[in-house]
């Protein structure tokens, strides 16, 4: 049964999506939402192929984008900061606030958060969690605004849909830019915000075309290539 179901789905994708065509952004987002077949509200993911050589240290592309329309995800935040900031961090909506006590919980396997923010004075504590946070991409970093004396703004950014990005070994940036029930216009606005920040993060050493290919998909759906002139 499983196999037939899959091929039926694949057949529908093949009928609806022309893999050789690049789509107008709004048309592409409409199509992705139409093809989302899962029972849950799927995320809309974007993959952007950059003209960089990621093996070279002067061509690393990383940063963060605040999505103007949010991501539709509930973001849980852990903040490492001293007593002076703790009350303000809790008030700003952080689920977990602490220092050595929070570090001990994380070391013990507590990972009920999606973003970690640290004030500079907490880095001695956070530094010891590198083996736990690093592999999950949760290590706070000044470049993405997650190591900052202003933890309140960082919490608000995270909660309002800040997305961190980093080009992988193949020079591709993956990011979630919303949910399938977002209007195409809102998804396009989110994507444009990401592209703007990627352009700002362009390494001086990168040669040739920087934005090579932009494709979108839902969690379980096929990839759709967007025509960049429509963005």
Curated annotation (Swiss-Prot):
Name listed for the protein in its UniProt record: Large ribosomal subunit protein uL1
Keywords associated with the record: Repressor, Ribonucleoprotein, Ribosomal protein, RNA-binding, rRNA-binding, Translation regulation, tRNA-binding
Signal peptide: none
Biological process annotations from GO: regulation of translation; translation
Similarity comment: family membership: Belongs to the universal ribosomal protein uL1 family.
Annotated gene: rplA
Function: Binds directly to 23S rRNA. The L1 stalk is quite mobile in the ribosome, and is involved in E site tRNA release. Protein L1 is also a translational repressor protein, it controls the translation of the L11 operon by binding to its mRNA.
Subunit structure, as described in the record: Part of the 50S ribosomal subunit.
GO terms of molecular function: rRNA binding; structural constituent of ribosome; tRNA binding
Matching Pfam families: Ribosomal_L1
